[in-house]
Amino acid sequence: CLVGSEMCIRDRVSCMPRTSREHVKPVRQKWFGVACCPPNITRTLASLGQYIYFQEENEIYVNLYVANETEVTLNGVPFKITLKGNFPWENKMTVSVDGVQETEAMIAFRVPAYAENFKILRNGKEENLTEDHGYIKISGKMYKETFEISFDAEPVFVPANPQVRVDSAKVAVVKGPLVYCVEEADNGENLSSVMVNTDQKIEETYDDELLEGCSVLHITGKKISEKGWNEGILYQNRKVELEDVKLTLVPYCYWGNRENGEMLVWMKELFYM
């Protein structure tokens, strides 16, 4: 479960036994000698409004789709703005703009780089959208308005630049703003021997019970079989055999909240020559 009382001090992209575990703990810790994490969380939450919104005179910019309520003044008129939704599990938000009286104003909605088929309904009617420097700007008379935002963000395989030596010929799985990982809790040990074919469609399900509820991704892959290897012998003149595996991926930000085990973000890509 997600208690929130323990944390990671390093954002590593893999956790393997007897290597990184020797100097980086494989489980979340309650406290560190350098206590930067708790106050950083506090500062971020306290300043979150500055990240969600940007205001300039009679213009308000919505940068992040985080459920919240705020009060602003546009053209001298007080407005209450409310964002409701279940992002990033659902790619839709409802934005209510409630003014004391009607006035001229502009509201701008950021279009995330990963968003496809971005749509906005204003009071139930679809708006003609023109993107300007990453934002959809809607100007005119504002009073009591409801904006319904929706877009697609399918999970995809993302390769590493070949100049990144340790991740060359490897891929990560990303959905919208979330990076995913495989954990030993779902997929067994020796995750470094897993390979995936990036031509497949990534399946997505929502698990109400897992980690307080989150979107889980499912893919198929190959894993180097350990059958026939002589115990204690590191190298053998033999053919490598592969076996089929089904892999479950969870959001990277949630890793380490279950059993102590391996974790991997970058997986080897399976090439067919």
Model-derived regions: residue spans:
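Solvent-exposed beta-strand/loop surfaces of large extracellular or lumenal domains
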Residues: 115-140, 157-163
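Catalytic cores of secreted or luminal carbohydrate-active enzymes
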Residues: 10-90
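Activation corresponds to long, low-complexity, non-globular regions
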Residues: 204-273
